[in-house]
Amino acid sequence: MRYFPLLLCLLAITTAEFRNATKQVPVVMWHGMGDCCCNPLSMGSVKKLFEEQIPGVYVHSLQLGSSITKDIEHGFYANTNELVYMACIKIKNDPELKNGYNAIGFSQGAQFLRAVAQRCPNPPMKNLVSVGGQHQGVFGAPYCIGDNIMCNGVRRLIDLGAYLPFVQKRVVQAQYWHDPNQVEEYKKRSIFLADINNENNNNPTYKRNLLSLKNLVLVKFNQDHMVVPKDSSWFGFYKDGDIDTILPMNETDLYKEDRIGLKKLHESGRIHFMDVDGDHLQIPRSVLVNDIIKKYFM
């Protein structure tokens, strides 16, 4: 009988370890421009879909700001580096995420989550799914649906000059504006994209942290009118000084010089390319369930 308490302790430890081992990996989501964390017709619906497909899963849909209104506003007007920092703090302070998480980003939320992976390795991001992201930036002002005051304001400011300091520091889309005809200006003035793509100062921690991913899934929309060029969703982009030529990922300097680890990820079979027929973020439920959730989140 003297061993009975010890056996009970061992049983309790084993049970706890089993529960931790079988617990579903939690999910972090980051929405796109003009959206918010909890819109029942967009992110709220996606969150519900994850919860239906993965019983018991914890889903954290990031809200950047003190309110839904602020969250939407920050999709247009903010310093992206500050948003990424805020996201890192939220993720680190969420006890449900302490053992790691899978992530899915929609539109600009995709490259923002990549920045989280590169800058904030604790807790660890396991898989990153990018849905219509702009990883090499855009060279085309965002398409505005209807009379959207914030979106139309962004277009006017970018037309004024994306690399002007007061525009660059305040307009989110300007911070991943990539002008192939002003490459040096882009490298010098871009406060976000040029940094996370290691265009100037080679930050080895960015590469090391991104290489810790198990999978990087890149989803491109074949009729995308929002992401220009749409190949940016696959890390492709215009050739410097030539907007008539689009280079695929493996022909870009970002890949060939392996600045952030793309080449190594690719050669190790951890980058997965998906293309979807449709316009920006028009992903069928069946594709989201069968080709993304069941493959990379379960």
Curated annotation (Swiss-Prot):
Catalysed reaction equations from the record: S-hexadecanoyl-L-cysteinyl-[protein] + H2O = L-cysteinyl-[protein] + hexadecanoate + H(+)
Signal peptide: 1-16
Catalytic residues as annotated in Swiss-Prot or TrEMBL: 107 (nucleophile), 224, 280
EC category name: hydrolase
GO biological process, one term: protein catabolic process
Cystine pairs: 37-38, 88-120, 144-151
Knocked-out gene: effects: Worms exhibit a developmental delay and mild reproductive defects. They have abnormal mitochondria in muscle and neuronal cells.
E.C. no: 3.1.2.22
InterPro entries referenced in this protein's UniProt entry, alphabetically: AB_hydrolase_fold, Palm_thioest
Family statement: Belongs to the palmitoyl-protein thioesterase family.
PANTHER family: PALMITOYL-PROTEIN THIOESTERASE 1 (PTHR11247:SF8), PALMITOYL-PROTEIN THIOESTERASE/DOLICHYLDIPHOSPHATASE 1 (PTHR11247)
Protein purpose: Removes thioester-linked fatty acyl groups such as palmitate (hexadecanoate) from modified cysteine residues in proteins or peptides.
Name this protein carries in UniProt: Palmitoyl-protein thioesterase 1
Organism, scientific name: Caenorhabditis elegans
Organismal lineage: Eukaryota, Metazoa, Ecdysozoa, Nematoda, Chromadorea
